[in-house]
Design a protein with these regions (language model features):
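A short, glycine/Asx- and small/polar-enriched loop/turn
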Residues: 51-55
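An amphipathic, aromatic/His-enriched active-site/gating alpha helix that lines ligand/cofactor pockets
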Residues: 27-42, 50, 60-111, 115-118
Length: 118
C-alpha cells in the first residue's frame, strides 16, 4: 500500500512569536495526531526557497484507505471519522488556540500526495 503525504502550509498571523507557536504545536497538536494509528505528523520550517522561514504541516498516512477512513471524503465539509473523534476527544480548544497563531487549518490549498516510489 502506498503512503499518503498531506502537505498543509501554515501562515502565521502578524506578530506571532515563532517559538511559542512551535512549542504549542509540539506540546498540544502533534500528540493529538499521533494518538491515531496509521498516521504521524511533522511540523517543518522552510530553510531555502520560496517558503523559507514559513511552516508546513506534513501528515503521513500509511495508505489511501487509512486516510479515507480517518478523514472521510465529504466535499467541502471537513471532519474525521467517529471512532477517531472518540479516540482524540474534544479538540475544539486546541484548534481555537491554533487560530490565535495562524490562519485556518487545513489550508484551502493543501494537497495529498500518494507515494509512487520509496
Amino acid at each position: 500500500m502506498a503512503k499518503v503525504l498531506g502537505m498543509h502550509t501554515v501562515e502565521l498571523k502578524p506578530g506571532v512569536n515563532e517559538q511559542e507557536f512551535e512549542e504549542f504545536i509540539k506540546t498540544d497538536v502533534l500528540p493529538v495526531y499521533r494518538k491515531v494509528p496509521g498516521q504521524t505528523v511533522h511540523l517543518l520550517k522552510g530553510d531555502r526557497g520560496e517558503r523559507s522561514g514559513k511552516y508546513l504541516m506534513l501528515i503521513e498516512l500509511e495508505s489511501v484507505e487509512r486516510r479515507d477512513h480517518i478523514y472521510p471524503p465529504a466535499g467541502d465539509d471537513w471532519g474525521v471519522a467517529e471512532d477517531v473523534q472518540q479516540l482524540v476527544g474534544n479538540v475544539d480548544p486546541i484548534w481555537e488556540k491554533f487560530s490565535t497563531f495562524a490562519e485556518g487549518f487545513p489550508d484551502p490549498t493543501f494537497t495529498d500526495y500518494v507515494m509512487v516510489s520509496d
